Design a protein with these regions (language model features):
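Bacterial N-terminal signal peptides
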Residues: 9-23
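Accessory beta-strand-rich segments of carbohydrate-active enzymes
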Residues: 38, 50, 93-199, 225, ...
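Beta-strand-rich binding/interaction modules
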Residues: 130, 212-253, 260-264
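Short, hydrophobic beta-strand segments
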Residues: 149-151, 263-274
Length: 468
């Protein structure tokens, strides 16, 4: 009888073949400068523990375990009360290394493509290297982030090596089970020099009725070349069947090594509104052209809906008074740990929908992108949470108020809040600003337990998500 491991090996092999086929097609395609957002979860090497020099490309990882992401190494370990904290599941943390070898993506003309790696979440304290060059460090385990690989990619035909170090030695750093490792999806984003940056599109619907809706599209356009470029930018609004609903086109010049912000508007007659009962979705297809050459093409999913709160009568969705019937969902799922298959989330949400639930609070931190997209599709309202700690820590062993000193293994986000909170909050909002399911952002969970500093924190939202 085939085993799970043999099935997984076969799956990984087939995925690798598809990647090779894609690479060949990329080189032969006249429109190869069009963006590709590639599944980068396959063909990773992993080893638990510390390995000196593992960021160096020549490091021998042949004995390391082969795996496909997402991956949570803590759930694979044995439960033990020696791990001291029931809050994090009596499971260990530790140190882990991931490595991946891959070829340099190329455009049709043979030039090296603009290549970025997008992580949806690594728990936690991650540092990423490409070919021995450190790209950066992120302490927060629930935030998406990306790095530009382009300057460090090999151009001589040799493989590149991505190395990721994860430090989960602070294994009592939360009041719930966190997991450890690259537990969310990874993508490789390949574009030309002129492109829409990752999270470079913001779509708002400031005027919505059943007869008419105004859709405002703000698009960042980046020119990484050494010369100015004049481009035509068209954004077409499509319904879920692909029907053209409306279009706006503008022409602009982008100086060398610079970014421009373009604003466009589409009026939609008789819009199909996004609602908890009928979660209708649209797509904004943005194309960037120079003369007849397609430089970039990016699709952004959205929903047309209006949100309003009234202190006396409550919440209104599309002008209709809706009673919020919500639950709190953490990011793990029992025996699969923190690396939750999308099918598990779909089943959970189906059961909750049958029970009459219409809203989810992502306790007590941001959910994965695929979870938010599933809520878009299934008609759930989402309150996206951010942090469980600000500047003062909580005592995780007692799962409550600050009591006594916090030791090393209990150090959580409070140690990094001052330096990282605004950066992380910006990333959280920019990633999810276009998801129609999100109707509220929360700046912190039970923060009165640590330090009441609401005014400066809400100032971050004024720069990022005020209209949301």
């Amino acid at each position: 009888m085939p085993t799970y491991r043999s099935f997984l090996s076969a799956f990984v092999f087939c995925t690798h073949i598809l990647w090779l086929a894609f690479s060949s097609a990329l080189a032969a395609n006249d429109d190869a400068s069009i963006r590709q957002e590639l599944d980068f979860n396959f063909d990773w090497k992993f080893s638990l523990g510390e390995h000196s020099g593992a960021q160096v490309p020549a490091f021998d990882d042949s004995s390391w375990r082969d795996l496909r992401l997402p991956h949570d190494w803590s759930i694979e370990a044995e439960y033990s009360q020696e791990n001291t904290s029931g809050a994090t599941g009596y499971l260990p943390g530790g140190l882990g290394w991931y490595r991946k070898h891959f070829a340099t993506p190329e455009l049709a003309n043979g030039e090296v493509a603009k290549t970025q790696i997008l992580f949806d979440g690594i728990y936690n304290h991650s540092e990423v290297w490409i070919n021995g060059h450190s790209l950066g460090y992120r302490p927060f385990g629930y935030v998406a982030f990306y790095y530009d690989l382009t300057p460090f990619l090999n151009t001589d035909g040799s493989d590149n090596v991505i190395a990721v170090h994860v430090d989960r030695s602070r294994y009592v750093d939360s009041r719930w089970y966190t997991g450890s490792g690259i537990y969310r999806n990874v993508k490789l984003v390949v574009t030309g020099e002129v492109h829409v940056p990752i999270w470079g599109t913001t779509i708002l619907t400031p005027e919505v009725t059943s007869e008419r809706a105004k859709v405002l599209i703000s698009t960042e356009l980046r020119n990484d070349s050494e010369q100015a470029r004049v481009v035509n930018v068209s954004t077409t609004l499509l319904d879920d069947s692909g029907l053209n609903i409306g279009r706006d086109m503008k022409r602009l010049e982008i100086a060398a090594r610079s970014t421009e912000l373009l604003r466009q508007e589409v009026i939609v007659a008789n819009p199909q509104l996004w609602d908890i009962d009928n979660p209708n979705l649209y797509f904004a297809q943005t194309e960037v052209r120079s003369e007849e050459q397609l430089l970039d093409s990016k699709s952004t999913r959205l929903g047309i809906r209006s949100l309003r709160n009234d202190a006396k009568t409550g919440f209104f969705l599309n002008g209709r008074n809706v009673k919020i019937k919500g639950v709190n969902l953490h990011h793990d799922a029992g025996l699969v740990g923190a690396a939750v298959p999308i099918g598990v989330w779909k089943r959970r949400l189906e059961v909750l929908k049958e029970a009459g639930v219409n809203a989810i609070r992502t306790g007590h931190k941001p959910a994965s992108k695929e979870f938010i997209e599933l809520c878009d599709e299934m008609g759930f309202l989402v309150q996206q949470e951010t942090f469980d700690e600000w500047e003062r820590p909580k005592n995780k062993r007692r799962n409550g108020r600050h009591q006594g000193e916090i030791d090393y293994i209990e150090q959580g986000y409070s140690e990094f809040f001052t330096e990282w909170a605004e950066k992380d909050l910006t990333a959280i909002i920019r990633r999810d600003i276009n998801n129609p399911s999100i109707f509220q952002w929360s700046i912190g969970n039970e923060i009165e337990w640590s330090y009441p500093r609401y005014i400066p924190a809400t100032g971050y939202f004024g720069k990022n998500g005020k209209s949301k």
